[in-house]
Amino acid sequence: MFGPAKGRHFGVHPAPGFPGGVSQQAAGTKAGPAGAWPVGSRTDTMWRLRCKAKDGTHVLQGLSSRTRVRELQGQIAAITGIAPGGQRILVGYPPECLDLSNGDTILEDLPIQSGDMLIIEEDQTRPRSSPAFTKRGASSYVRETLPVLTRTVVPADNSCLFTSVYYVVEGGVLNPACAPEMRRLIAQIVASDPDFYSEAILGKTNQEYCDWIKRDDTWGGAIEISILSKFYQCEICVVDTQTVRIDRFGEDAGYTKRVLLIYDGIHYDPLQRNFPDPDTPPLTIFSSNDDIVLVQALELADEARRRRQFTDVNRFTLRCMVCQKGLTGQAEAREHAKETGHTNFGEV
């Protein structure tokens, strides 16, 4: 069967005897997974915070609602030169000191919100930071521990989701020919549990869905990502360049690994971390505790959004490649497909 041997080789283990059974609300459509996401997937949102220190006001970059306290302190250290152990972070009026005792606390669990101004002071009751911990040293440390995340472009051939997932779980193997087997795998899983994968979930009968997903002109979405997350037993994070958010599939399942995709409204690409040493292969599988990679993914999405590198699926112009009718947005495309049975669309 597709996946198990190579998945194990790279540390992503398909679930033994996997029958399906992932909670979800709506199937992906020809226009991708915009809209409802599976129950249990979680969204990260980018946060914008400022900090005020002795040398002025600074903008803190690359934070999300799930950034940990220790990562926030690392960035503050890079800006101010105050070691994390000597920081006092105050917020509000009158200013109150945040509890920094647990470095694993995430920002959304603190009494702060995006847009707040943080006041940074040095705790005079603690030993002063050593001369080696300067702004320059801290900045170098942060740069070394935050390698750049990059996108690998895969073919836009209606199977970009499957090619992208294969790429990341196989440790950086680009193989568009994997798509038919992945489609058959998903069809087998769905067919094995018709009670769960009902028409209410799939938007069509179980048999119709299985026939549909095996075609090479249909697009994958939330349903397929959820199934692949459980099959490979890893969290699949999809960062959206239009909304600058991350939807996380399989987060609550206790998986120890995560992989990342970037989505622009109609196309998926895999994300990977490259290293300066050309002999070191790119990293595509991350620890599920590595929240730094999530922040980097949000930064990448935010940059793409500012450059308008996304497609608004509710407004983009399509043409039915069967009858050549012009359509606007995924809603019209979905209705046209329902009325005519035509499902091959191209973007104009």
UniProtKB/Swiss-Prot annotation:
Domain of life (superkingdom): Eukaryota
Outcome recorded upon mutating residue 295 to Q: Does not affect activity or specificity. Impairs ability to cleave longer 'Lys-11'-linked ubiquitin chains
ZnF C2H2-type span: 318-342
Signal peptide from the UniProt entry: none
Localization (cell): Cytoplasm
Region annotation UBX-like: where it falls in the sequence: 50-128
Assigned EC number: 3.4.19.12
Binding site for substrate: 266
Ranges of Basic residues composition bias in the record: 1-11
Region spans: Cys-loop: 154-160
GO cellular component, one term: cytosol
Stored CDD domains: OTU_OTU1, Ubl_OTU1
Gene Ontology MF terms: cysteine-type deubiquitinase activity; deubiquitinase activity; K48-linked deubiquitinase activity; K63-linked deubiquitinase activity; ubiquitin protein ligase binding; zinc ion binding
Record-linked PROSITE patterns: OTU, ZINC_FINGER_C2H2_1
Chain residue ranges for the region called Disordered: 1-39
Catalyzed reaction equations: Thiol-dependent hydrolysis of ester, thioester, amide, peptide and isopeptide bonds formed by the C-terminal Gly of ubiquitin (a 76-residue protein attached to proteins as an intracellular targeting signal)
Residues at the catalytic site: 157, 160, 267, 342
Subunit architecture: Interacts with VCP; the interaction is direct. Interacts with FAF2/UBXD8. Interacts with DERL1; however interaction is dependent on the UBAX-like region, suggesting that it may be indirect. Interacts with PLAA, UBXN6 and VCP; may form a complex involved in macroautophagy.
UniProt note: domains: The UBAX-like region mediates the interaction with VCP. According to PubMed:19818707, it corresponds to a UBX domain, which is a hallmark for VCP-associated proteins. However, no canonical UBX is detected by prediction tools such as Pfam or PROSITE. The C2H2-type zinc finger mediates specificity for 'Lys-27'-, 'Lys-29'- and 'Lys-33'-linked polyubiquitin chains but not for 'Lys-11'-linked ubiquitin chains. Selectivity for 'Lys-11'-linked ubiquitin chains is provided by recognition of the sequence surrounding 'Lys-11' in ubiquitin. The S2 site region provides specificity for longer 'Lys-11'-linked ubiquitin chains.
Task of the protein: Hydrolase that can remove conjugated ubiquitin from proteins and participates in endoplasmic reticulum-associated degradation (ERAD) for misfolded lumenal proteins. May act by triming the ubiquitin chain on the associated substrate to facilitate their threading through the VCP/p97 pore. Ubiquitin moieties on substrates may present a steric impediment to the threading process when the substrate is transferred to the VCP pore and threaded through VCP's axial channel. Mediates deubiquitination of 'Lys-27'-, 'Lys-29'- and 'Lys-33'-linked polyubiquitin chains.
Name of the featured protein: Ubiquitin thioesterase OTU1
UniProt source species: Homo sapiens (Human)
